[in-house]
Design a protein with these regions (language model features):
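A structural signal for beta-strand and strand-to-loop patches characteristic of beta-rich domains
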Residues: 22-386
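Bacterial Sec-dependent N-terminal signal peptides
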Residues: 1-26
């Protein structure tokens, strides 16, 4: 479940009156009135830099609902972050009436080479898509205070971010043929030992629901965090990665017990437990083409003689809200018209009769509505004279 909409919907439900009207209607009404988000894009003057260079940038700040220049924020914060995740410099940029701003960073010789990050955000963007990364006491004690540690392990999904290499300055001016990066000074931060193979599973819709058929995506990483291609088995079926360490498979989820997958990597066999099976919830499978997206739903362990809803959000705005009632087997099918959605990523959320999110799924829409129109130029005369 994406954090921004799960948290947003739960906050709305918590504020509903006890003697509620139709909770689905209230959810729909509040989603329609959801605050408009902002988006930022930074245009840099280059794709890579050398120590001693200047990084010039131009910023574009737009409203997420229509991609027009923002009329909300007038201050933009732009940060340069070192390869080890520490803040090098933060700049405050004034956003003009056209949603633009500009500035530059100096890559001083005191910095070391490596992959740097530049990120940009407005204060308003900090209200959306917040994720707290898990951390232990040992890692938090590496910071000067709790606030620094909290900021380091907090991720804002709406922040614009771009990573680029910074190379060592060449020995002779103008000799840029050889680009090299010198390893940064060694730190004494203890490195946690990692398994040689790590596999993470992502059930479609967010959960494995007992007694349903599920599609499960997975990603395989080695001890250095690099994606690797592997083969294995799950529930008697052969599974394998399809591209850059990622793959998917379908599985019949049993009513009881646990599921596991077994992989062979570099001569060693690894067993991984799939996410816990839940007795109550909604299994979601989405099929889509150019015209429509069809959500196949299977609800288990919940009341069936009640209305549920599917909400579709794009650009932070509610684009579709459909009610449905599952059949006697708990199954239902909801069709989304993709022609009515803007190009980009949309989020489909299944909501129960109490207004709580049950499952969600991202899907992509490409309607070519951002393509620039051709301009035709014609003259009113064949010849012109001074």
């Amino acid at each position: 479940m994406t954090n921004k909409f799960k948290l947003f919907i739960m906050m709305m439900v918590a504020s509903l009156p006890a003697a509620a009207q139709d909770k689905l209607s209230l959810i729909e009404s509040r989603l329609e009135k959801a605050p408009v988000q902002e988006k930022v894009y930074l245009h840099l003057d280059n794709n890579c830099y050398y120590k001693g260079d200047d990084i010039w940038y131009k910023a574009y700040v737009v409203r997420a609902d229509d991609n027009m220049y923002t009329d909300m924020s007038r201050l933009l914060y732009v940060e340069l972050v070192s390869p080890d995740g520490m803040l090098v410099e933060r700049q405050t940029v004034v956003v003009n009436a056209n949603g633009n701003g500009e500035g530059s960073f100096v890559l001083t010789d005191s910095l070391y080479s490596g992959f740097y990050e530049i990120r940009a955000y407005t204060r308003w963007m900090m209200n959306f898509c917040v994720t707290e990364h898990p951390s232990n006491r040992q890692s938090r004690e590496l910071f000067y205070n709790r606030q620094m540690a909290s900021d380091f392990f907090r991720l804002y999904g709406t922040v614009h971010s771009r990573v680029f290499p910074v190379y060592e300055r060449p020995d002779e001016k103008g000799e840029y043929a050889q680009k090299y990066i010198v390893n940064r000074p060694k730190s004494r931060i203890p490195k946690e030992l990692q398994e040689r193979l790590r596999v993470t599973f992502y059930p479609e819709g967010g959960h494995l629901i007992a007694g349903t058929k599920a599609t499960v995506a997975f990603e395989a990483l080695d001890e250095e965090g690099q994606q690797v291609d592997i083969k294995g088995t799950a529930a008697g079926k052969t599974i394998a990665t399809e591209h850059e360490g990622r793959g998917r498979f379908t599985i019949d989820v049993p009513d009881n017990g646990n599921l596991k997958a077994t992989f062979l990597f570099e001569g060693k066999e690894y067993d991984f437990k799939l996410p816990n099976i839940e007795r109550f919830g909604c299994a979601l499978h989405l099929t889509d083409d150019k015209q429509k997206a069809v959500a196949q739903l299977h609800i288990r362990g919940a009341q069936l003689n009640a209305d549920y809803a599917v909400a579709v959000l794009s650009q932070g705005v509610l684009k579709d809200f459909q009610r449905f009632r599952p059949d006697s087997k708990g199954q239902a099918e909801v069709t989304i018209n993709k022609g009515e959605l803007p190009s980009g990523v949309s989020d489909l959320i299944v909501i129960d009769p109490e207004g709580q999110p049950m499952a969600d799924r991202l899907f992509f829409v490409r309607n070519f509505d951002y393509e620039q129109q051709l301009i035709t130029v014609s003259a009113d005369s064949i010849d012109y004279s001074p």
